[in-house]
């Protein structure tokens, strides 16, 4: 199924699992576009909240060993039934272009366009392995409009 046909559930409870406090184990590539680059691991702590009767979700994440923090604002479009995920971080002070998509069979896929080090990239976020006490997120970039993907960041979340 393509990102254009993927839809969110009829009720906007998709991101309710993120509400609360989480310990996060990060694993990301040292070069986001090179699938042969080394992985680095580091911790984070995240706090998620629900807003607009489930139509919005917000989380703040602190990366204590990296010296930065970020936030994600997720907004549910009741007309299109899709989520738009907006990321910002303290390093840049900039709101990155959103990734858009939804959940199907417990897996969320979200796509968007951005640049990385001056190169245009297609961006994919995947949420999977969602339980009451854990979840997995991953990010991938494509430089060939989705023909191939380099998964460059994993987060494993464990509820505090």
Description of each model-found segment:
Residues 1-160:
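Hydrophobic small-molecule pocket/channel-lining residues, especially in calycin-type beta-barrels
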């Amino acid at each position: 199924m393509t990102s254009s046909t993927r839809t969110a559930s009829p009720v906007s409870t998709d991101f309710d699992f993120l509400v609360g406090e989480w310990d996060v184990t990060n694993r990301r590539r040292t070069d986001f576009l090179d699938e042969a680059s080394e992985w680095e691991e580091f911790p984070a702590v995240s706090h998620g909240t629900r807003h607009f009767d489930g139509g919005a979700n917000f989380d703040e994440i602190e990366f204590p060993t990296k010296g930065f923090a970020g936030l994600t604002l997720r907004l549910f479009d009741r007309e299109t039934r899709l989520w738009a995920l907006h990321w910002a971080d303290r390093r840049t002070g900039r709101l990155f272009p959103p990734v858009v998509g939804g959940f199907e069979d417990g897996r969320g896929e979200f796509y968007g366009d951005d640049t990385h080090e001056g190169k245009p990239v297609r961006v994919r976020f995947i949420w999977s392995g969602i339980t009451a006490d854990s979840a997995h997120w991953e990010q991938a970039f494509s430089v060939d409009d989705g023909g191939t993907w380099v998964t460059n960041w994993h987060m494993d979340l464990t509820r505090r």
